[in-house]
């Protein structure tokens, strides 16, 4: 390969790199983000054990096993939803 091609490929890489790095955000757009749980669906803890694990982080910085457990505790503790996933700091 000539040095001209190497320079061209290097510049092309520098130009296209930001697009490849930020293209992941396309898939995590607002329509794909999990919304706050609909707590009217959950009435008691007994029905929570049948629901799969789907962690919810609340404003008390505790991680709840799934939406159901979060919603039941929300009534008692007046919690606010932060995001779906494990709370990353305590």
UniProtKB/Swiss-Prot annotation:
CDD domains per the UniProt record, alphabetical: KAZAL_FS (cd00104)
PROSITE patterns reported in the protein's UniProt record: KAZAL_2
Glycosylation sites per record: 38
The entry's keywords: Glycoprotein, Secreted, Signal
Main location: secreted
Signal peptide, first to last residue: 1-23
GO cellular component, one term: extracellular space
Matches recorded under SMART domains: KAZAL
GO BP term (any one): negative regulation of sperm capacitation
Tissue: Luminal fluid and mucosal folds of the seminal vesicles (at protein level). Not detected in brain, heart, lung, liver, kidney, stomach, small intestine, muscle, skin, thymus, placenta or bladder.
InterPro entries named among the record's database cross-references: Kazal_dom (IPR002350), Kazal_dom_sf (IPR036058)
Sequence ranges assigned to domain Kazal-like in this UniProt record: 33-89
Compartments, record wording: Secreted
Pfam families named among the record's database cross-references: Kazal_1
Induction of expression: By testosterone.
PANTHER family: SERINE PROTEASE INHIBITOR, SERINE PROTEASE INHIBITOR KAZAL-TYPE 11-RELATED
Function of the protein: Does not function as an inhibitor of trypsin, chymotrypsin, subtilisin or elastase. Binds sperm and enhances sperm motility. May act as a decapacitation factor, suppresses BSA-stimulated sperm capacitation and blocks sperm-oocyte interactions in vitro.
Protein name: Serine protease inhibitor kazal-like protein, minor form
Record organism: Mus musculus
């Amino acid at each position: 390969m000539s040095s001209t091609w190497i320079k061209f490929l290097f510049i092309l890489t520098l130009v296209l790199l930001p697009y490849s790095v930020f293209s992941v955000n396309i898939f995590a757009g607002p329509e794909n983000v999990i919304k706050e749980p609909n707590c009217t669906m959950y009435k008691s803890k007994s029905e929570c054990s049948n629901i799969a694990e789907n962690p919810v982080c609340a404003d008390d910085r505790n991680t709840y096993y799934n939406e159901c457990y979060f919603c039941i505790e929300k009534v008692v503790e007046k919690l606010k939803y932060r995001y779906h996933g494990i709370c990353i700091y305590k």
